């Protein structure tokens, strides 16, 4: 009999606004790339789930920390007309949470740490990318995995980390073990690990898209939330 865990689940009603048409990547009554045009009357429950088993190339992680992102709030928050605020890729019902860190429980067949090319060890501390890119489509091959043609997003259209355990592809995991040199308390490592995803948003804007900054440059940062502070 499968062991159980609890997860924070967001539910919403599929009710496309008048004139809405399914996009090429939308799936009727399942997911859309225009969440605020489709999903209505959101509500949250705490539900019981089977603890998932990792398949080939996947890793089972015990979640230790997970941040609350503005997008989590905007998916759970409705406008006056009942539609959710969040405009992006969404598929409900779904466990929320994507700013996560945790401990490897076990790896599925062939699951490897991309930094070492060795199998993941139980007990290794890791964090995860929020976007589950395929690695084989043209945008992925061109170095733009955030434009993946078969994109899934943790906590948006596939189950996220507001739960006790999560299974993720090995290619989307990053080891936090080097942080042992900076932190004596493992709890601090997990907190730092949960900040990797939001900090990477600021890094992508400043370095990848913005071209970087140099000593003496004058810059303006619009926003004083976690991403703005990271930038």
Descriptions of predicted regions:
Residues 87-98, 114, 134-222:
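NAD(P)H dinucleotide-binding glycine-rich loop of Rossmann-like/cofactor-binding domains
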Residues 71-77:
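Cytochrome P450 core scaffold surrounding the K-helix E-X-X-R motif
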Residues 2-8:
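Short structural boundary motif marking the start of a folded domain
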Residues 15-65, 87, 91-95:
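A short N-terminal beta-strand-loop micro-motif at the entrance of redox/enzyme domains
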Residues 228-229:
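N-terminal Rossmann-fold NAD(P) dinucleotide-binding loop
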């Amino acid at each position: 009999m499968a062991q159980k865990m609890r997860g924070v689940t967001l539910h919403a009603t599929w009710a496309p606004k008048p004139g809405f048409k399914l996009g090429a990547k939308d799936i009727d009554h399942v997911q859309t790339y225009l969440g605020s045009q489709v999903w209505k009357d959101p509500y949250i429950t705490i539900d019981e789930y089977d603890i998932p088993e990792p398949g080939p190339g996947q890793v089972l992680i015990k979640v230790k920390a997970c941040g609350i992102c503005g997008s989590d709030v905007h998916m759970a928050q409705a406008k006056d007309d009942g539609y959710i605020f969040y405009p992006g890729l969404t598929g409900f019902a779904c466990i929320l949470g994507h700013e996560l860190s945790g401990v490897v429980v076990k790896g599925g067949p062939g699951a490897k740490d991309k930094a070492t090319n060795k199998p993941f060890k139980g007990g290794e501390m890791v964090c995860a990318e929020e976007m589950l890119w395929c690695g084989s489509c043209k945008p992925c091959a061109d170095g733009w995995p955030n434009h993946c043609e078969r994109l899934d997003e943790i906590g948006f259209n596939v189950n996220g980390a507001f739960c006790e355990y999560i299974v993720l592809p090995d290619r989307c995991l990053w080891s936090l073990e080097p942080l042992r040199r900076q932190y004596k308390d493992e709890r601090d490592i997990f907190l730092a690990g949960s900040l990797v995803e939001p900090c990477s948003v600021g890094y992508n804007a400043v370095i990848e898209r913005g071209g970087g900054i140099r000593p003496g440059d004058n810059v303006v940062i619009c926003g004083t939330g976690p991403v703005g502070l990271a930038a």
